[in-house]
Amino acid sequence: MAEAGWNMKWILGLSLTLCLVVQTALGALHTKEPLLITKHGILQGKQVHVGDTPIQVFLGIPFSKPPVGTRRFAPPEPPLPWNGIRDATTYPPSCLQESWGQILSMYLNTRKQYKWLHFSEDCLYLNVYAPVLAPGAPLLPVMVWFPGGAFLAGSASTYEGSELAARGKVVLVFLQYRLGILGFFSTGNSHARGNWGLLDQIAALRWVQENIEAFGGDPDSVTLFGQSAGAMSVSGLMVSPLAQGLFHQAISQSGTAVLKAFITPDPLTSAKKIAHLAGCDHNSTKVMVECLRSLSAEEVTLVSKRMSFFQANSHKDPKEIVWFLSPVVDGVVFPEDPVVLLTRGQVKPVPYLLGVNNAEFEWNLPFLMKIQLNQRMMNQTNINKILWSFNVLLNITKEQVPVVAREYLNDAISNHDWKMFRNRLIDLIGDATFVYATLQAARYHRDAGSPVYLYEFKHHASSGIIIKPYNGADHGDELSYLFGSPFSKGSSAGEEKEFSLQMMKYWANFAHTGNPNGEKLPYWPRFDKDEKYLQLDFDTRVGVKLKEKKMAFWSQLRQSQKP
C-alpha cells in the first residue's frame, strides 16, 4: 500500500508538471494568473491589458542569491531553485538607499499610481513585462532597463512597462543593482575589488540569456537601455569583456562612461573615509572589509548619510567631496579605464543610440544636490567658489574656473540679469558633463564602426510634484514619454500622446532592427562625420553639430589640461 501511495503521488506530481508545460507551450498565459517555468522554478504572474493587447507581468524575480552576510562586497551568485509556485505579482524591495531615493522615484514615476518603495539589502530582483504570444509566433526583441540615480538611488519598480511592451512589441526587463556603499565600495585590492553593482547588472543579463525565451523574448536580440547612472552603466558595459555577447544594441540616455566621475581613480581614499565613519578604521584592508560586513543595513545607511554623498558644498575643499561611489578599474569588469579602451576603438561595434536633454541641470539635480539657485550667487567670488566645488564633475582645473565663468556667466553678472544667469548656469553644467561626454562617446563608437544615432530631447515636460520655471527638458523628463505615461496616467492631451507614441516607436524600432527609423516617423539620420542628430520635440527635426561652439570651447579646455 505504501508503494502504491508513493506511485500515486509521483503520478500526480508528474501530471501537474506536464500540465504546466503544456499550458505554457499552448499560450495558456492568456489566463488572468499566468504560470511560467524558468530555469529556477515556476512563477505565477498577473495579466493586464493595454487596449486589446494582453501583457503578462512577472514581478520580483530573483536573479541572484541575496547579497547579504558573507555575500556583501562579493560578486552575485546564481539564485537557488525553489519548490512549488513562486508568487510574482508584488513589487520587490528596492536596493538599500537613502530616503531621497523615494523622492527621486516619485519624481520619475511613470505609473498611474505611485508605488511607495521599500528598501532592503536583499534586492537583486527584476520585473518582466511581456506581450502574450500566439502559438508558433516568433520571439520578440528584449529591452533591459538600467535605472539611474547617481549609483546611490534607483528602483525597477519606479517604472511601468506595459505601454512600451504592448505598443513596441518587445519584452521589457527592469533590473536592480546594489547601490552606494553596498554596490561600489572598493579598497582597490583583492579584499574588495568593487563594481558589485555592475556585476549585478551582468548577472541579470546572464539570467536574461538563460530564461527570457520562456517569456517570449529572443536572447539573440537584447537591447540595453538606461538613464543617468543607468546610461553610464550601459556605456561602460559596452567595453567590458564580461558583458560581451550578452546584448546586441545599446541606448544611453543622459550619461556615458566618458563622464570623468564614472570612474573613481583612488577608491582607497573613499574606503578609508567610510571605514572611519563606521568605526572600522584599520591598516589592514582585510580587517576593514570584515568589519564593514558586520554592520547592519541600518548602520550602512547611517554611514552613507554621514558621507554626505551628492551634496554640493562650496565651503569645503573639493578634494574632500565624495559625490558618489562609482565604478573602478578592477582588472575584471574593466581591464583598463573605459575611456582608454574607447580611444583605442576596443569596443564591439553594436548599434548605439544615445542623447541628452537640453536642460539637464534645471531642477531635478540641483534639488537632489541641495544647491540653492538664487541671486546671491550672482557675483564673481561666489560663482568661482561654486564652480570650483564642482571641479570633479565639470573636469576643470582651478585656473580654468574664471575662463569658464567668462564664457558663460560674466555678461549676465555684469547686467544683473538673474534669469539669464540661471539659464546660462544650467547650460554650463549640462554642457560640461552630459553633452560633452555624450558627444565624445558618439564619436568614439562612430569611429569604431558602430551605427550611431544621436538625439537632443527638448520637450518641457510637466511634473506631478513640481512646477519648473525653466522652459527646457530637465534630467529624466523623457522617461514619462518613453514609458507611455500620457496613456497610462490618462490625463494628457492628444499632442502629448502622439509625442509619447513617437518616442516609443523610435526606441522599439531600434530594439527590433538596430535602426530607429520606421513608417510615419520623421527621419533620423545616422551620426556620421557630418554629425547630424535628431531634436526630439512636438516638431521633431534634424539638427547638425550639437552645440558646436560650446563643445569646441570645452574640447580646447580639456586639451589644455596638463596630463
UniProtKB/Swiss-Prot annotation:
The active site is at S228, E360, H475. Disulfide bonds join C95-C123, C280-C291. Glycans are attached at N283, N379, N395. Keywords: Disulfide bond, Glycoprotein, Hydrolase, Secreted, Serine esterase, Signal. GO terms for cellular component: extracellular region. Gene3D superfamilies: alpha/beta hydrolase. It is found in: Secreted. It is an enzyme of class 3 (hydrolase). Residues 1-27 form the signal peptide. It comes from the Eukaryota. Its EC number is 3.1.1.-. InterPro entries: AB_hydrolase_fold, CarbesteraseB, Carboxylesterase_B_AS, Carboxylesterase_B_CS, Type-B_Carboxylest/Lipase. GO terms for molecular function: carboxylic ester hydrolase activity. Probable carboxylesterase. Belongs to the type-B carboxylesterase/lipase family. This is Carboxylesterase 4A. It comes from Mus musculus. The lineage of its organism: Eukaryota, Metazoa, Chordata, Craniata, Vertebrata.
